[in-house]
């Protein structure tokens, strides 16, 4: 199958270029693709904003734990017929509480607590999904790998609400969050609400993960959160520039990934992730080569 697909890939490319520009506009005329593009662009935009702060606060591992911790919440919510977003959000909040509890009540470090909770919740989620699929004969693998082409109008509405909440928080608390991100001790000294900022930010991380999960699934969601932010940090000179760059990269990669997935009939989630990773490595090699050249001129 793989050899056959690779053999037909050049033919598909030639077929696309031989047709008019209307072939590229076709996906935008389909309702399910329109919803997919909107969800993907919102997820990428939020991931770029939230991911920049995640990188600077060195919370990448914690975000990975949260992304996998939502799995049992999704499974339980599906079983009881309640909105999946509530189950996922509750599971992520519980995971953060347990991580902080283990860290404060024992001599274990935070990364150890994160690893324990990450493995426990993910294992529980896989077990619950297996049991549910066996009893109800339904396919829940889209929790793991995403199902952006199966987006409903309700999903679009919930995602728009989440976008509004997150943007409202960042607009109203940007200066406080920026101060806390770069110097938590000074932020506490001048009387900023540290606990509120940290707790609210983690909840918004969970909401961003839930939105992104629709696009690329639980397993790959960390890549969408981290890679655009890391790319922005490579070339950014200020926090505002990093946020802007990572958001533009995330949105561009999401758009191009979904378009390529439709044109070549390949999964959209992995395609988006691979494009973001490719851009990161290209910029990394260019910047690294430039730095090496500069260093060689200094000596």
From Swiss-Prot:
Keywords in alphabetical order: Cyanelle, Membrane, Plastid, Transmembrane, Transmembrane helix
Main localisation: plastid
InterPro entries, A to Z: ABC_BtuC-like (IPR037294), ABC_TroCD (IPR001626)
CDD domains: TM_ABC_iron-siderophores_like
GO biological process, one term: transmembrane transport
Pfam families, alphabetized: ABC-3
Entry membrane topology: Multi-pass membrane protein
Subcellular location: Plastid, Cyanelle membrane
Disulfide bonds: none
Transmembrane stretches, start-end: 13-33, 36-56, 79-99, 112-132, 151-171, 201-221, 241-261, 267-287
Gene Ontology, cellular component aspect: ATP-binding cassette (ABC) transporter complex; cyanelle membrane
Family the entry assigns: Belongs to the ABC-3 integral membrane protein family.
PANTHER family named among the record's database cross-references: ABC-TRANSPORTER METAL-BINDING PROTEIN, IRON TRANSPORT SYSTEM MEMBRANE PROTEIN HI_0360-RELATED
Name assigned to this protein: Uncharacterized membrane protein in ycf23-apcF intergenic region
Protein source organism: Cyanophora paradoxa
């Amino acid at each position: 199958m793989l050899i056959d697909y690779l053999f037909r890939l050049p033919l598909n490319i030639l077929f696309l270029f031989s047709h008019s520009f209307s072939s590229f506009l076709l996906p935008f005329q389909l309702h399910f693709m329109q919803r997919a593009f909107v969800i993907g662009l919102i997820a990428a935009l939020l991931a770029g904003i939230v991911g920049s702060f995640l990188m600077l606060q060195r919370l990448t591992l914690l975000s990975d734990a949260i992304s996998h911790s939502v799995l049992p919440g999704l499974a339980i919510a599906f079983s009881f017929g309640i909105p999946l977003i509530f189950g996922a959000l509750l599971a992520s909040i519980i995971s953060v509480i347990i991580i902080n509890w283990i860290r404060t009540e024992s001599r274990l470090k935070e990364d150890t607590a994160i690893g324990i909770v990450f493995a426990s919740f993910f294992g529980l989620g896989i077990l619950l999904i297996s049991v549910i699929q066996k009893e109800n004969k339904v396919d829940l693998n889209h929790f793991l790998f995403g199902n952006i082409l199966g987006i409903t109008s309700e999903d679009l509405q919930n995602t728009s609400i989440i976008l509004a909440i997150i943007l409202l928080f960042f607009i109203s608390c940007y200066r406080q969050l920026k101060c806390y991100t770069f110097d938590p001790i000074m932020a506490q000294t001048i009387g900023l609400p540290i606990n509120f900022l940290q707790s609210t930010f983690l909840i918004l991380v969970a909401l961003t993960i839930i939105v992104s999960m629709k696009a690329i699934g639980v397993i790959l969601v960390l890549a969408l959160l981290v890679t655009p932010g890391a790319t922005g940090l490579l070339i950014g000179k200020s926090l505002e520039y990093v946020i802007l760059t990572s958001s533009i990269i995330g949105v561009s990669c999401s758009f191009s990934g979904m378009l390529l997935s439709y044109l070549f009939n390949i999964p959209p989630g992995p395609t988006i992730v691979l494009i973001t990773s490719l851009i990161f490595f290209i910029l990394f090699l260019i910047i690294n080569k430039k730095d090496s050249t500069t260093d060689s001129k200094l000596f």
